[in-house]
């Protein structure tokens, strides 16, 4: 809009935004859609003759390197100049190319005449620059292109623009994978959402730059900018620090039959490409993510599904044409969820490369299903290059397990999952690479699970503190430096069952790229172990409230001499006696995560709830029942995971304890009601059935609750805690659940001796 009439007077500029329109992507997705204008806003003043700034939001200058080799390379500069004056203009356009060291490589100059109100397109290519310094993630050499527009007569500078470019070439091959500058190169990548608690997506430029620095520190060389174009500051750091990039527009889940949707998708694609065309880090443009996921789950009948598939195929073909019109120097891609239907309907053959979002061993199946699926795809489509565009498992630092399994959200299962996936990606030559989902624990408004509204598959927390698993990747990917990390920062408060005065043996894992590690507890050596898959696990004896754990490894990466690398951490430990009858229970608070194999440490109280166990004489445990779980959010508590697991059909619970007065606390949440599940759980639904549950609670033959109903006292999916003081004269506390309707259940139990 023209504001000349408003110059030299005070003005207010207001912008009203609305993201509710259904003809603008994204219309759905497994991430929170924050609103508002959250990127930088610039008010740009220009001369009457200037570079074209209204070309889909670009800067009006497009730079590429059409001819590149180790011996020589050329730079192509094209763009448009506008003359907004009422008379013709005689101009001079100069392009100066600077070497990475700042010296001038070449200068191009031309004279231009533009009629009043018209636009001029220019195109200039340098003569060959000999022995160019190639751009790679390890050596991100950048050449600067300075474009200067002057008045031909007065030499007055009318407009000026600076852009970086890099000399590199690349290829994707179905058998050989990815190559950069003529050499095989594994894409070691991360997907990145952009939010951060508590500011949503309104990150500062410094925050965007910090994220790329963290990825580079880990050893990543590739980023999938998912699922939407992100801040210029991010791509600037990709160029400068060396991070290959995949950028995409947010066409997700389903293609609606909405007027204008196709046109807006096309516009989104042109905007992304033109705005970010000059970044040498970008190697691929994407335009669809899991586009059949919602489609196939919502529409089962062929007459409903067929027109949607036809729309989807038509849009993909149209966008592929647009992409190649805009940029022939990069490749196209789409990301598919793990279903061969993409190939069956024809989507798999449209783009240059295919991305697969695979979660075998998390949402379903087992871990080895990952490599089996990839092998099947490669056998069927051997010429089609593949990237594993998503893989990951959730983790909650409050949850830990010595028997980790899928969807328990323990830190240990995420580690187990990724320790399986990464070697497959690294060792399979036809896989171009992978991008872990996700770099951060990000906001997802539709998710419940252990951390409601959060998808917790990140390698770092929302505040960007690295999880222990971050250092597994660092050990695997950073072969230029020694890495040694005791992987217990996410588990500093430990507990375990102690038999007599014997220490409790618990695993301590170390991530390292050094061949051998020695571990110490309170200064005493536990010996040395060889590294396997960048990890070493020691069985460590815990017996007191605090231990200092230290790891030491010989660093043979040093060129001049051999040195040692060390890491240390303090761990808190609470022993729980196996024989309660023979112990002093005065200071004991025995808390049990009923129905779960996980330790749970409350981040509010630091109290650790132990995994459940069957009753044994002189000890404690459940009698009867089976484990059940739900991923629905539990209200009225911040300790949701404690209430998402339970023992269903439990007959009783028993503690063999000395006589005295005890406080018993029961945790209940009735999860036995149908509730909505999100399609993004990829078919992993709760296994509970609808029913009303009522039962009596009996302690040492005394009925303390008749026809108890958790849902009547606190509603379904609401946390309920009930405490009772019991005088024990029997050297045992025996709890029985007598069913009146449905089944009995228990989510948690806590015992504390008062007197």
Where on the chain are the PLM-derived regions?
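Secreted/periplasmic carbohydrate-active enzymes, especially glycoside hydrolases
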Residues: 4-225, 237, 242-245, 268, ...
């Amino acid at each position: 809009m023209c504001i000349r009439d408003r110059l030299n007077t005070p003005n207010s500029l207001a912008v009203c935004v609305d993201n509710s329109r259904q003809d603008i992507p994204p219309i759905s997705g497994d991430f929170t859609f924050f609103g508002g204008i959250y990127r930088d806003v610039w008010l740009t003043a220009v001369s009457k003759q200037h570079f074209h700034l209204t070309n889909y939001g670009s800067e009006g200058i497009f730079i590429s390197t059409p001819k590149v080799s180790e011996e020589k390379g050329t730079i192509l500069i094209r763009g448009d100049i506008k003359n907004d004056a009422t008379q013709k203009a005689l101009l001079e356009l100069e392009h100066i190319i600077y070497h990475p060291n700042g010296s001038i490589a070449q200068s191009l100059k031309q004279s231009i005449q533009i009629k009043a109100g018209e636009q001029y397109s220019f195109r200039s290519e340098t003569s060959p620059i000999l022995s160019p310094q190639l751009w790679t993630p390890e050596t991100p050499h950048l050449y600067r292109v300075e474009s200067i527009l002057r008045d031909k007569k007065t030499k007055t500078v009318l407009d000026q623009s600076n852009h970086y470019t890099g000399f590199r070439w690349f290829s994707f091959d179905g058998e050989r994978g990815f190559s950069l500058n003529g050499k095989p190169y594994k894409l070691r990548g991360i997907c990145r959402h952009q939010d951060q608690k508590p500011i949503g997506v309104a990150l500062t430029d410094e925050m965007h730059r910090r994220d790329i620095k963290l990825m580079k520190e880990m050893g990543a060389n590739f980023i999938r900018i998912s699922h939407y174009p992100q801040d210029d500051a991010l791509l600037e750091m990709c160029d400068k620090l060396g991070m290959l990039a995949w950028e995409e527009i947010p066409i997700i889940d389903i293609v609606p039959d909405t007027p204008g949707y196709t046109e807006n998708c096309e516009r989104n694609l042109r905007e992304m490409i033109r705005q970010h065309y000059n970044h040498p880090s970008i190697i691929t443009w994407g335009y669809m993510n899991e586009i059949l996921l919602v489609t196939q789950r919502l529409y089962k009948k062929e007459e409903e599904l067929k027109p949607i598939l036809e729309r989807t195929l038509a849009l993909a073909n149209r966008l592929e044409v647009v992409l190649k019109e805009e940029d022939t120097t990069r490749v196209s891609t789409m990301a598919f969820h793990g279903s061969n239907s993409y190939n069956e309907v024809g989507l798999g053959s449209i783009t240059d490369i295919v991305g697969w979002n695979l979660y075998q061993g998390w949402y379903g199946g087992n871990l080895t299903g990952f490599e089996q699926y990839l092998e099947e795809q490669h056998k069927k489509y051997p010429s089609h290059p593949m990237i594993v565009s998503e893989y990951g498992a959730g983790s909650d630092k409050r949850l830990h397990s010595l028997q980790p399994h899928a969807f328990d959200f323990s830190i240990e299962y995420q580690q187990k999952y990724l320790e399986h996936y990464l070697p497959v990606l690294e060792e399979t030559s036809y896989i171009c690479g992978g991008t872990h989902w996700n770099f951060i624990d990000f906001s997802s408004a539709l998710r419940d699970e252990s951390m409601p509204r959060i998808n917790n598959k990140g390698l770092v927390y929302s505040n960007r503190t690295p999880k222990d698993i971050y250092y597994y990747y660092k050990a695997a990917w950073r072969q230029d430096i020694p890495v040694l990390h005791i992987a217990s920062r996410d588990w500093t408060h430990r507990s375990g069952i102690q038999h007599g005065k014997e220490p409790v043996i618990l695993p301590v894992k170390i991530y390292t790229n050094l061949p051998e590690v020695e571990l110490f507890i309170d200064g005493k050596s536990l010996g040395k172990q060889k590294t396997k898959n960048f990890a070493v696990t020691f069985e460590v004896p815990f017996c007191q409230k605090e231990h200092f754990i230290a790891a030491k490894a010989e660093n043979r990466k040093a060129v001049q001499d051999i040195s040692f690398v060390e890491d240390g951490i303090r761990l808190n430990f609470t022993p729980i006696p196996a024989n309660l009858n023979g112990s002093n229970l005065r200071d004991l608070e025995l808390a049990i995560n009923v129905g779960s194999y996980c330790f749970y440490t409350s981040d509010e109280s630091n109290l650790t709830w132990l995994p459940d166990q069957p009753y044994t004489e002189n000890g404690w445990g459940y009698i009867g029942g089976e484990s059940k779980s739900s991923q629905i959010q539990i209200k009225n508590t911040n300790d949701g995971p404690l209430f998402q697991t339970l023992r269903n059909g439990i007959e009783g619970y028993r503690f063999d304890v000395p006589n005295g007065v005890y406080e018993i606390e029961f945790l209940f949440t009735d999860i036995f009601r149908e509730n909505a599940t999100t399609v993004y759980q990829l078919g992993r639904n709760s296994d509970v059935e609808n029913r009303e549950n009522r039962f009596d609670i009996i302690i040492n033959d005394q009925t303390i609750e008749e026809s108890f109903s958790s849902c009547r006292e606190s509603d379904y999916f609401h946390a309920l805690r009930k405490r009772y003081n019991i005088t024990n004269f029997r050297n045992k506390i025996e709890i029985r659940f007598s069913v009146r309707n449905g089944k009995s259940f228990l989510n948690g139990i806590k015992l504390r001796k008062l007197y």
